[in-house]
């Protein structure tokens, strides 16, 4: 098969692993930067054309691919999802599909979708820019978490110890036209959460993450320490339901243990492979490529 990965940094562990694994399975894989595409909608068939601007040389018409794996970061969500939509319109299987990918990249819309599917999430509010910050902050508990809608790797997640701090941070962000959601802080989790790697209807690997000393964010990119973990059936079920609620084939589901029970913090559409493979000892890349092969075959 001829596979395409959409990614700006081909040297990242996840990209290298996926490319190597695909090639070992006898496939060819090109890695292209979504920001180097030109997308065209035209009258004549094929209605959807794509051109690519290589590093050196002139742009060329994109050849056909059998499937595409989106692995672009949050800085490229808009163009990346546009490229993905164009490829999906040409009936090229996408791991994940463009609508689900875009939904997962918006923290508020995805929490709404999770709640609509009866999946427990932390109490969260999203206020319009003209809603009084003080009244918005009163709707959640203190200390309060504030999150920008499309942050990642822990960036854009803020802990305000006092209500007054939450109000001033919210006012500052709103004035800067940065939409933000407010959320109950789950302090009882002790800066730990669980990352579940879901492929299809299975959790293929999981790990516990704990924030380093003095840090409430458990993200590996923020220095979080990882540990092997065996999930209960209940935890597995919630993770798979969360991925399915957003329509994702591949997802990194973050779970947090609160005093009210297990909650879904967020669902990532392009979860990293490095720490989950190294911590769990499971070859996640091979399972992703095997799943993609089945998807291409229409199984
Ligand atoms: N409501 C919360 N209560 C306690 N900790 C939280 C909460 N929300 C996020 N965190 C911590 O911050 C980390 C990053 O938050 P998350 O919503 O997953 O955003 P990101 O996309 O940046 O990973 C989580 O892994 C968790 O450790
Ligand atoms: Mg996260």
Swiss-Prot record:
GO molecular function terms noted in the UniProt entry: ATP binding; metal ion binding; ribosomal S6-glutamic acid ligase activity
Name of this chain's protein: Probable alpha-L-glutamate ligase
Database matches in Pfam families: RimK (PF08443), Rimk_N (PF18030)
Organism lineage string: Bacteria, Pseudomonadati, Pseudomonadota, Gammaproteobacteria, Pasteurellales
Superkingdom as given in the UniProt entry: Bacteria
Membrane-spanning residues: none
UniProt: Mn(2+) 2 binding residues: 266, 268
UniProt entry tagged with the keyword ATP-binding: yes
Residues reported to bind Mg(2+) 2: 266, 268
Ranges where the ATP-grasp domain occurs: 111-293
Residue numbers binding Mn(2+) 1: 254, 266
Binding site for ATP: 147, 184-185, 193, 217-219
Gene: rimK
Keywords of the record: ATP-binding, Ligase, Magnesium, Manganese, Metal-binding, Nucleotide-binding, Protein biosynthesis
Family that this chain belongs to: Belongs to the RimK family.
Cofactor note: Binds 2 magnesium or manganese ions per subunit.
Cofactors required: Mg(2+); Mn(2+)
Enzyme class per UniProt: ligase
Enzyme Commission (EC) number: 6.3.2.-
Matching SUPFAM superfamilies: Glutathione synthetase ATP-binding domain-like
